[in-house]
Amino acid sequence: MADDLSSVENAGHLWMEGKTLVHLRGDQDRPTHMPRGPAKRTGPGFLNPAMAPARTRSVLLLADALEHDWLVKPGHDIRALDALCATGVRVRRWRNEIPAVHQGRLRVSANDLDETALNWLTTTHDRYPPDTEIDHALEDDRYTRAPSGTMHNGVFVMQNDARIALMEAAYQWVDLDPFGSPVNFLDAAVQGLSRVAFLEVTATDTAALTGSSPSSQQRRYGAKGIVDSYAHDDAVRVLMGLVATTAARHDRCIEPVLALFDGHHVRVSVKVRRSRDGASDVLSSMGWRVREQGGTYRFVHHPDSEQVERASGPMWIGPLWDKTIAERLTEDRTIDLCFPDEDRLERHRDVGLDWSSDDSEYAKRELRRSVRYIADAADLMSRNHTLYHMDDLPNMAGTGQAPKMEALFDEIRTLGYGAARVPDIDPFLVTDAPHDVVLQCVRERCQD
């Protein structure tokens, strides 16, 4: 591969995402610390800073799997693939930010068709290597052939169509992050998993998933949407449903771990295991969201003729998170794992990083935002619950105004129910309280 980075090293500039140095192209602006929405593409292998929170959560989840052994047996390796890696920021963060004690168990592969992006990955990774040196022996693929690619400081780099890369080995961890819809890659992703594995899927075609583009939603996801306060949750559940039914076609079942609507994209993270019985039971977790009078909703497996116009789906109607795992995704854990200490920061500055104390504060704020509200909402999002958009509550309760969120949460909790904020760009309440209890709590707090 040609060393594209060396030829333009004076034109580009350094950035830090998490603990990891990223050499940006000269034609890409220095990112803002709180990006929202998709970045403007500046050429092959562009860095999308708005995806940084998703990459941070990926580091946290993979580190958690290694630390708590919920994916493979204690001491066993995890083979992880970023199937559409672009410039490889995610895999480089895996190597830089997952604790050194676990690095020897982590076998990382990165794949992309874009040669320029891979050049950028390998040269940057070689120039700014991780602290822990990893030199795994190469393993044959599932067809006992020698793999096609090169090893760079613990990252095996391949240049293939993602569907080929996914099918050539059995991975315990697969990240699928396309530019647009993941539909074209899902079958290969599921087939490329080992018997028990973890799959993370990103979709940036939110107009299709929410129903804002009904024709695209029907073509890609076979679903019908309603654009209202629940469109974000619908988008998450439509994508989760597609992953679940795709897995079922290959005699596999899913267990949701985390699922979020994060600005311009939807991302779902699931455990996948081979089970014919589990696959046969997938329809018990599929259904429709039917809007009710008064602004709330309920899930049904099959809407009747009177409900169809008020229904969106089909979608996943089961729990969306794993409580035990999600409640460990705290802000303190994120800073400990993904923010550099002063020694590392000085070493980064020594090689050219322009980074001020204000940059550090902004970066910490961004890292905290990546997981904000997740631990608090973990219990409710892992079982049956109801969502309420805070802006809808005044009309529902007839109060003309909404109470402060924390005050409403406290009121609901005093009655023995759970209440938390959902990590969404909009202010959502998640609770297990009955609808009439929620409205009574709104009225009580609005009288104070």
Predicted features by range, described:
Residues 1-448:
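SAM-dependent transferase fold signal centered on methyltransferase-like domains
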